[in-house]
């Protein structure tokens, strides 16, 4: 029976190295560099390349990929433990070669790409030389593929791509886009959509504008409103078979959702650390904040909620490793997705309140973290949709009763128990 919560000693050594390396070398980058996806920033690359070289020398580069692609092929449990460290810094995933959306794009290129596609797009992505964009969500349809209108129509030997996409991550820095489009409107969206790899320099690829999150300016924004206008592609640009986009997307998004949750744990622990430090450092008339019952309650609630969420994430990661089939853990991943923004929001809000006016200022990270919590409630599908997924998957394990009363109706259970053990109660029955 394998059921323990201990980390293999050899891997714990690697985690300890990561923890120190990220704390001392990587976290400071968040305060001196602009964007980890901007490969044209020569100063940033001058700093990042030596750090990436250290990670590669340690054998910790692109750990989500197998040895055939230059990674160690870590399972989701190891990735979860690793991402709980990397999530502390916006630059850490880039330093370790596992940054979204590039990591997810690399996975589907590895699974579904042709060899020429892997040579042109995957290898430079794995080497950290370029950035990529996953262009799926639409202004009207959101993340629901049944409402997508972006389409690609066959014209001789070419495909002509037209449509608009919304919130396309890192479009401004991307060397190529992976675009989901309707190719057969006569059948179900689940079978009538295809994925295309679109080089950024292709005529007709236009960024309408960059879209900031919260108070981000358009100049600093990391997402884009895209328009694809008569973009001409060939079959060489197809990722996978025509009509296979939905299946490809599920492979990509399943892993992406759990990885977001893993990194969120790091942010939760950062907020909790700040909360506890503040409680011990700040005093009122009656002593430190930590001596107040209401503050102790907030600290206890936060610690419990973080540990509950961490266990939910780790269990989902363990099941992914065990079954190697995202369909079998669909409701586990959806449950993680639902729990993530709430615990993130609640813990950060408590930490913010303990810091008073300082907490809502731009001298502390809480407002950015709160916005991050709301982003997590929408990224890769809104919370409400994932709640529906959880409920539907769970209800499949049950069936309705044909009786008038519930199956756990106490009089019925009592009568059945009496029948089962009647021989032991004959004297009582005789006396009645």
Residue ranges and their predicted role:
Residues 158, 162-208:
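A short core secondary-structure module
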Residues 141-148, 154, 159, 168-169:
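Hydrophobic, small-residue-rich alpha-helical packing segments that form membrane-like cores
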Residues 147, 203-232:
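Flexible, small-/acidic-enriched active-site or ligand-binding loops
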Residues 106-112, 134-135, 186:
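Flexible, glycine-rich active-site loops centered on histidine and acidic residues
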Residues 128-136, 180:
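A short, Trp-centered hydrophobic/proline-enriched beta-strand micro-motif
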Residues 1-92, 99, 112-117, 124-129, ...:
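Alpha-helical interface subdomain recognition
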Residues 229-247:
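Long, acidic (Asp/Glu-rich), low-complexity accessory segments flanking structured domains
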Residues 140-143, 167-170, 185-187, 213-222:
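Short Gly/Pro-enriched turn/cap motifs at secondary-structure boundaries
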